[in-house]
Amino acid sequence: MSNIIKQIEQEQLKQNVPSFRPGDTLEVKVWVVEGSKRRLQAFEGVVIAIRHRGLHSAFTLRKISNGVGVERVFQTHSPIIDSITVKRKGAVRKAKLYYLRERSGKSARIKERLGN
């Protein structure tokens, strides 16, 4: 029984997901349905958390929009995600960057990771 579930989940995994880590800045293009129209909407932010659970993997992006912090959780293998682009690689030493919620301005900056 579990082999059937694993096989079905394996078929639904996306193959074109780039590798990224917490601290990286991503641009995620998402399909949005408004009435009868479908359009792409971009969300660019810093990865503050990643949840590795196979087909149920997710990541959280945070950005500041008009002075207000906005966080959005994306399911990594969701069909509404059109593309994920890594814009900038950040150098951090923690897996969860929840401390960025309390910071603003220059203290919320993340150094750029050079090299790999």
Swiss-Prot record:
Keywords: Ribonucleoprotein, Ribosomal protein
Record-level GO cellular component terms: cytosolic large ribosomal subunit
GO molecular function: structural constituent of ribosome
GO terms for biological process, alphabetical: translation
A Pfam cross-reference name: Ribosomal_L19
Top-level taxon: Bacteria
SUPFAM superfamilies referenced in this protein's UniProt entry, alphabetically: Translation proteins SH3-like domain (SSF50104)
PANTHER family noted in UniProt: LARGE RIBOSOMAL SUBUNIT PROTEIN BL19M, RIBOSOMAL PROTEIN L19
Family: Belongs to the bacterial ribosomal protein bL19 family.
Function per UniProt: This protein is located at the 30S-50S ribosomal subunit interface and may play a role in the structure and function of the aminoacyl-tRNA binding site.
Identification of the protein by name: Large ribosomal subunit protein bL19
Lineage, top ranks: Bacteria, Pseudomonadati, Pseudomonadota, Gammaproteobacteria, Pasteurellales
